[in-house]
């Protein structure tokens, strides 16, 4: 495993399975991935969500996201296991450009000075927009009044 590549696998489980079965599936796929040479970076259950379209007569599904690293050989085993499982209704694995981004801090990614900068930019943009709108109104009213004067001369 000299050449490590980052992957993300998202799979959808049937909505009617019990919560302990969901945990068993997550553990099973995590264990299978590690046994086949992959390294788990992050595993998250995203919860039950409505599907965009019906899949295998289901309108909802339980989403699970799995971020992992490996040489690529481990993907075949995990996808084969998902394909053979009746509880997995859809799965997709994509190659990532690099490692996972670091999670944002609890202040939602903005400090107070950045927030003030954004607010000042917003107020500047609003005032410039109002000035442009006023200029257009003035130009339109001037051209309308000059056209009216020309028609009176004729």
Curated annotation (Swiss-Prot):
Residues 103-112, 140-154 have a biased composition (Polar residues). GO terms for molecular function: small ribosomal subunit rRNA binding; structural constituent of ribosome. Residues 113-139 have a biased composition (Basic and acidic residues). One of its GO terms (biological process) is translation. Keywords: Ribonucleoprotein, Ribosomal protein, RNA-binding, rRNA-binding. GO terms for cellular component: cytoplasm; ribonucleoprotein complex; ribosome. InterPro entries: Ribosomal_bS6, Ribosomal_bS6_CS, Ribosomal_bS6_sf, Ribosomal_S6_plastid/chlpt, Transl_elong_EF1B/ribsomal_bS6. The keyword Protein biosynthesis does not apply. Residues 94-154 are annotated as: Disordered. Belongs to the bacterial ribosomal protein bS6 family. Binds together with bS18 to 16S ribosomal RNA. This is Small ribosomal subunit protein bS6.
